[in-house]
Each structure stands twice: as structure tokens, then as C-alpha cells.
Amino acid sequence: MEFDYTNLREFIKINFRTLKGFAVFLGIGTTQLGQRLSNKVPFTQKEIDKVANSMPDGKLDMETIDSLFFKKK
């Protein structure tokens, strides 16, 4: 199953400015992030949890998490 990460890419621009900044936040390399965004490797539960619960503005709600990580193509 492939996911549409358009909303996640916009979220990254707003909150991290660059893919590299987001990769550093997740603790992965930019190549690994690219693989995730191109549906070659899935995001891990740990990575999704980190985004959901570690944002400076507070925890993300389930609707937002769904739109970022689980929107189907």
C-alpha cells in the first residue's frame, strides 16, 4: 500500500524548513527519510510517535496524524 505524503511534506516545510532538519529530528539520515517519503520503506511506529508527541506546539490529534502518515494514494 502506498501513502500520499503531500501533507507531511507541507508539515515539514512549516515546522522544520528542510528535509534534513526533519531527518535530524527523527534521528535518521536524509537518504532514509527519502526512502520513507517515496514509499520504499515505511515510517516506524517510533518515528510517528515522535512526531505526534514531541512537537513544540503540543501533541498532534489523531486526525492530523492520519492526514500526515496514513493518507492513501
Q: What does each model-found stretch correspond to?
A:
Residues 7-8, 33, 47-50:
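A general alpha-helix detector
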Residues 13, 38-40, 49, 53:
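Residue-level detection of the helix-turn-helix DNA-binding "recognition helix"
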Residues 46-64:
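DNA major-groove recognition helix of helix-turn-helix/homeodomain DNA-binding modules
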